[in-house]
Amino acid sequence: MHKYHLNSPYLPKGDQPKAISELVYGVNQGKQYQTLLGATGTGKTFTIANVIEQTGRPTLVLAHNKTLAAQLCNELREFFPKNAVEYFISYYDYYQPEAYVPVSDTYIAKTSSVNEEIDMLRHSATRSLFERRDVIVVASISCIYGLGIPSEYLKASVKFQLGNDINVRESLRELVSNQYVRNDVDISRGNFRIKGDVLEIGPAYEDRLVRIELFGDEVEAIRYVDPITGEILENLNSINIYPAKHFVTPKDRLLIAIQSIQKELKDQLDFFNQEGKLLEAQRLEQRTKYDIEMLKEVGYCNGVENYARHLSGRDQGTPPECLIDYFPEDWLLVVDESHVTCSQLQAMYNGDQSRKKVLIDHGFRLPSAADNRPLKSDEFWSKAKQTVFISATPGDWECEVSTDGIVEQVIRPTGVLDPVVEVRPTAGQIDDLLDEIRKRVIKKERVLITTLTKRMAEDLSDYLSENRVKVRYLHSEIHSIERIEIIQDLRVGEYDVLVGVNLLREGLDLPEVSLVVILDADKEGFLRAKRSLIQTIGRAARHVDGFALLYADNLTESMSTAIQETERRRAIQQAYNQKHGIIPKPAGKKPSNSILSFLELSRKLQNEGDNADLVSITSKAVDSLNQSEDLGIAFVELPEIIDKLEGKMNLAAEELDFEQAAKLRDRIRQLRKKLSKPE
C-alpha cells in the first residue's frame, strides 16, 4: 500500500505542532468541520501537508482560482515528491457558453478551446484515484461539474497483463469505443497504432507512450517508451488503459438514452404546441432530431453534454457525478481561502441555471439540459464527510459549523512579524506614494498597490510609468497562466510595482514585497471590508520590514477591525520571539519558475511554432498595449504583431464576437500609432 512521505528539511515550529496535533485528532475523531485560522506566512500549507501525511487520507484541496491552485500544487509536489499530487482545473483556454438573447433574437453557439496539457492532467488525477490511496488532487471550483460516471469509466478501461492471451481485434475495438483514434503515422496522446506485433498507445493521462509487444496473441512485453526517441523508460507487468474521455456511454445504455430523449422531445413539443409556440417547437424538433441521428451513427454530437442526464441514466433533478465521486469513502476535503471558495459554490449553480432557462424556454434545448450543471452548495457539502477550512479570515459560516474545531496559527517559523500599519490622509497621496516606492526600489524590494476601480489602476500605472517606475497593471482580463508569469516577473525584479483592483488578496506568496498600499481605504464596500483589508495587509507579512500604508480621511469600522487584528497578531508574535530569542529573518523561498514548468508551458510554446508566437506575442499586445515598452515588445516586432492581431480580429468577427473584434481593432489602432512614432 502506498503511504504519504513528507519531504521537508524543516520540522514544525512555533504553533504549527499544536495546530497539526489538533487537526489530526479532529480528523481521526470524525469531526465533520474544522477551521485552520492561520495568519499569512505562518506555513498553513506545511501544516496541512503534515495533517495529510499523518491521517493518510486521499485528499481534495479546493482553491478558488487557477493561479492559487497551481501554486498550491507546486508546494505540495515539493512536500510529496514520491506521492501522487495532481492538478485538476477547467481545461478550457477559451470558453463561450451557449446562450440566447431574446431582446435582440441573438443565438450564441458554444465555442471553446481545450488545453490538451490540462486535459491530460485531469485524466492523470482520475487515474491516480483509481490506482492508489496516496493521492492529493489540487482543484479549482470547476471540479463540481459533471465528469462522466466513475464506475463506467473504470469498467471501460482496457487491461493488458504480461503473459496473457488477448484478442487483438477486440482490444482495438475497445480502444476505439473508448474514443482513442487510430493513427499509424503520428502517435500522440489519445491515439494508437499497430505495426506487426507491436501495439503503441498514447494514454489520455500520460506524455509517455505505452508499447504492447505481442507474440501471436500473447502479451510478451509491456513498456513505457519515450514518444520522441523511442527509448524504453520502464517495464511493466500489467497496465490499465483508461478511456480518452471521461464521458463513456456503453452501447446498450446509449440506445436506452436515445429512447428517453425521444420521449422527452415528444412531451416538450406537445407543450409548445399547446402554448402556441410553433417557432420554438420547430426549432427544438429540428435540433434534437439531428442530435439523435448523430448519436445513433457515431455515438456523439455537438453539445452532447446537454443530454448527460439521459446518457448517465439519472433521474430528473438528481446531482451529476463529478470529481468527488472518483474519491473513496474516507476522503478528506481541504478548502483553501475558504471565505472566498465557499461562497463561489452557490454562485456557480445559480449562474448556470439562469442561462439554461432561457435556452429551454425558447426551444434551443430540452428541459433535461438544466441537469447538465454544477453541484448545488448543499449537494456538495452532503458529499464532503470531513472538511478542513483554511483562511486568515474565515467566513461566518465556516466559524459557525466549526464550533469546536477552530485552530489558530499565528507564529511564523521565520519570526517575521505582521506588518506595521499606518493611515495617512489622501491629500498629496500620489507624491507621497511615489516617494515611498522609490525608497523600496533602492533596496530592491517590491510594492503592491490596490485601487478601487480599473480606471484608477490604469491611470496610476500610467503616472508611475511616466515617472520611470517599472510598473505592471494586473487586471481581470489577463488569462490565469499569464497572471502566473506576471507574478513571477515581479518576484525576479522585471518590474518593482504591481497595481491591481481585487486580484492581490488571497494566496499570493510574495516574500519580496515589503510595502502594500491601499488607496481609498475608507470607502466601505466589498473591496474595503474587514476581511479584504486583513488579506491585503497580509501581502506584506512575509517581509522582515513589512509595511502597510492605508490612504484615508476617515477611520471606518472595517479599517479599525483590520488594524486591531493585525496589531493583536503582531503583539503575540513579538512576545513569542522575545521569549525564545528569535530574530526575524527573511523567507528562504527562491523565486523559481516551478509553476510554469509544472504546466509545461515552455515546451508547449516551443513545439507549437507559429501558434506559440501568436499566443506569446499577441497576449502581451492585447492585454497591455499601454505598457508595451515595459513588456519588451521591440519596435521592429510591431508589424508582425499587428498582422497577427488583425487575424484574431477577423476570426472574432467571423464568429460574431463583435465586442472582442472591436477591442482588437482599437488595440491595432494604438499599435499603428506607436509604429508611426519610431524610437
UniProtKB/Swiss-Prot annotation:
UniProt keyword annotations, A-Z: ATP-binding, Cytoplasm, DNA damage, DNA excision, DNA repair, Excision nuclease, Helicase, Hydrolase, Nucleotide-binding, SOS response
Ranges of residues in domain Helicase ATP-binding: 25-176
Domain Helicase C-terminal: 429-591
Residues engaged in binding ATP: G38, A39, T40, G41, T42, G43, K44, T45
GO molecular function: ATP binding; ATP hydrolysis activity; DNA binding; excinuclease ABC activity; helicase activity
Major localization listed first in the record, in broad terms: cytoplasm
GO BP term, example: nucleotide-excision repair
Record bears the keyword Zinc-finger: no
Entry annotated with the keyword Disulfide bond: no
Sequence motif: Beta-hairpin, positions: 91-114
Localisation: Cytoplasm
PROSITE patterns hit by this protein: HELICASE_ATP_BIND_1, HELICASE_CTER, UVR
Record-annotated UVR domain positions: 639-674
Gene3D superfamilies to which the protein is assigned, alphabetical: P-loop containing nucleotide triphosphate hydrolases, UVR domain
Homology family: Belongs to the UvrB family.
Domain notes: The beta-hairpin motif is involved in DNA binding.
Subunit structure: Forms a heterotetramer with UvrA during the search for lesions. Interacts with UvrC in an incision complex.
Record function comment: The UvrABC repair system catalyzes the recognition and processing of DNA lesions. A damage recognition complex composed of 2 UvrA and 2 UvrB subunits scans DNA for abnormalities. Upon binding of the UvrA(2)B(2) complex to a putative damaged site, the DNA wraps around one UvrB monomer. DNA wrap is dependent on ATP binding by UvrB and probably causes local melting of the DNA helix, facilitating insertion of UvrB beta-hairpin between the DNA strands. Then UvrB probes one DNA strand for the presence of a lesion.
Annotated protein name in UniProt: UvrABC system protein B
Species of origin: Prochlorococcus marinus (strain MIT 9211)
